[in-house]
Amino acid sequence: MTNIRKNHPLLKIINNSLIDLPTPPNISSLWNFGSLLGACLTIQIITGLFLAMHYTADTTTAFSSVTHICRDVNYGWTIRYLHANGASVFFLCLFIHVGRGLYYGSFTLLETWNVGIILLFSVMATAFMGYVLPWGQMSFWGATVITNLLSAIPYIGTDLVEWIWGGFSVSKATLTRFFALHFVLPFVILALVMIHLLFLHETGSNNPLGTSSNSDKIPFHPYYTTKDFLGLLLLILLLMVLTLFYPDLLGDPDNYSPANPLNTPPHIKPEWYFLFAYAILRSIPNKLGGVMALILSILILAIIPLLQPNKQQTMMFRPLSQFLFWILVADLLTLTWIGGQPVEDPFITIGQVASILYFLLMVLIMPTTCLIENKMLKW
């Protein structure tokens, strides 16, 4: 009698994806982040569902309903902070996952990489809309400033902004539609994740050496299920420490004041995971130019496969590229820091230099270095 998990129409899919999946034997802990992102998405959907049961998407009661969740609902504060800090942990895993893809040349798996970029945009859109829902000062002004950027689009900009707002300013209509979209988008993300995995399992995983591992593979279970479980425990530890000891560490104090259209906060800034893109936006004096740079800062990932002429897939044996990769990481950390600073010197200049360096590294310096390394290896 054959095993049911190998024959049953539904169990067969799970078996081929999580149990008998042939996996390279040498993938490091950096390959854990895919499963950790799945865990983060699950946590966000479950906590979000419970929050939605008590939240009201109305400008007069939204702030009060969040306060009610934290004060009166059983373990409401835990669910709320798990959801808020879960987003931070989600983005931390997301950035490491993308970084690993860049370092080890996973962008050569084109379909998987492109679906991943769509996923990144979807998660960023969902997180932005979620930040608006508590209807605090930073929620309101963040929504006003970021949606207003669309007015930079020639001809249709102003109409587009008013269409998104559902009126002439951020109002009840805006909040209601943001809540509806914030609720439905995670399920769209879930579908995209399935497509992402489908494409990945067509080609199989990359590995740190960048060589084909078809001749030497091991089953995913028990080897990598155990390894992923350890990563999951560490992720839950980090999330619990954040939630139970430092729940407001990554939040903004301004969001504890109800939204007031007549009073602008001194420094409008998004959550930490958007600060690098926000710094790039602010470093360009022209509005349309800033918006284009903001979008390109993420969209540039889509042209990475065209810009990498390297003959070796990974950076493991390419010290020059490794050095530039870590400069890129340092540059992004600098941009994140600058995004949270006020718009004054020397922060403006540092932001502009870091923004130029970011695009130069991606488009010019790293591809040129790849060519030099190819020459050095006589390829």
Swiss-Prot record:
Compartment(s): Mitochondrion inner membrane
Ranges that cross the membrane: 33-53, 77-98, 113-133, 178-198, 226-246, 288-308, 320-340, 347-367
Cofactor note: Binds 2 heme b groups non-covalently.
Record carries keyword Coiled coil: no
Entry's Gene Ontology molecular function annotations: metal ion binding; ubiquinol-cytochrome-c reductase activity
Membrane topology, record value: Multi-pass membrane protein
GO cellular component: mitochondrial inner membrane; respiratory chain complex III
Main localisation: mitochondrion
Ligand binding (heme b b562): H83, H182
GO BP terms: mitochondrial electron transport, ubiquinol to cytochrome c
Entry keywords, A to Z: Electron transport, Heme, Iron, Membrane, Metal-binding, Mitochondrion, Mitochondrion inner membrane, Respiratory chain, Transmembrane, Transmembrane helix, Transport, Ubiquinone
Pfam families named among the record's database cross-references: Cytochrom_B_C, Cytochrome_B
Database matches in InterPro entries: Cyt_b/b6_C (IPR005798), Cyt_b/b6_C_sf (IPR036150), Cyt_b/b6_N (IPR005797), Cytb/b6-like_sf (IPR027387), Cytochrome_b (IPR030689), Cytochrome_b_C_euk/bac (IPR048260), Cytochrome_b_N_euk/bac (IPR048259), Di-haem_cyt_TM (IPR016174)
Annotated binding of a ubiquinone, by residue: H201
Binding-site residues for heme b b566, renumbered to this chain: H97, H196
PROSITE patterns in the record: CYTB_CTER, CYTB_NTER
Cofactor list: heme b
Family of the protein in this entry: Belongs to the cytochrome b family.
Additional note from the record: Heme 1 (or BL or b562) is low-potential and absorbs at about 562 nm, and heme 2 (or BH or b566) is high-potential and absorbs at about 566 nm.
Quaternary structure, from the entry: The cytochrome bc1 complex contains 11 subunits: 3 respiratory subunits (MT-CYB, CYC1 and UQCRFS1), 2 core proteins (UQCRC1 and UQCRC2) and 6 low-molecular weight proteins (UQCRH/QCR6, UQCRB/QCR7, UQCRQ/QCR8, UQCR10/QCR9, UQCR11/QCR10 and a cleavage product of UQCRFS1). This cytochrome bc1 complex then forms a dimer.
Functional note: Component of the ubiquinol-cytochrome c reductase complex (complex III or cytochrome b-c1 complex) that is part of the mitochondrial respiratory chain. The b-c1 complex mediates electron transfer from ubiquinol to cytochrome c. Contributes to the generation of a proton gradient across the mitochondrial membrane that is then used for ATP synthesis.
Protein's UniProt name: Cytochrome b
Source organism of this protein record: Lepilemur edwardsi (Milne-Edwards's sportive lemur)
